[in-house]
Amino acid sequence: MRILVTLFAAALLVGCQSRVADVFDSRQNAGPCPPVGAVYDVARYVAFADGTDETYPNITYTAEIVDVRMFCRYADKDPLVAQMEIDFAFGKGDAARSDTHAYPYFVAVTRRNGKVLGKEYFNVEADFNGRKLDGRTESIARIEIPRLDESIAGSNFEILVGFDLTPEQLEFNRAGKRFLLNAEQ
């Protein structure tokens, strides 16, 4: 009886394997994936308490996009489909009033010439739990880029990420100022 159960289980597993293998597309990518990265001017987030100077004791929250990774798939005339992971590092300053903070960020698909084809906004939540530092990896399961025909390669596009900053935060970053709360470690 044990032999029959073992053979039956093996037959089921082999059957499952073949169905799972059929789901994966074995065709070669039609070309390279689009380059992906964080836009330098908006890769850092620094917020100060309202009405205060831009000094270290007045920092409420900071964040930085640490890494961006992408996997893409396309063949023949299929649209380019990408999955992305974004690593964030967060800091909570002495002027912060809450143990959680939502950081707004965007993901944009552009042509290599800079024309924005699509842009979506997201929030990533930091939960400090009484600590000063936190980190998180956010996953975006599906980014789809339609292609006119199979001659259009992923290298014709870029996928860019950054924080959705206020004009003051953007000016702070462009001035080259940096306050990262993990600098004291």
List where the protein language model places each region.
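Bacterial signal peptide processing site
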Residues: 17-20
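Low-complexity, acidic Ser/Thr/Pro/Gly-rich terminal tails and inter-domain linkers that flank the onset
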Residues: 54-77
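Short, solvent-exposed, Trp/other aromatic-anchored flexible loops in extracytoplasmic proteins
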Residues: 124-157
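Post-signal peptide N-terminal segment of mature Sec-exported envelope proteins
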Residues: 24-51
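Sec-dependent signal peptide recognition
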Residues: 1-9
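C-terminal motif of bacterial Sec signal peptides marking the signal peptidase cleavage site
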Residues: 12-15
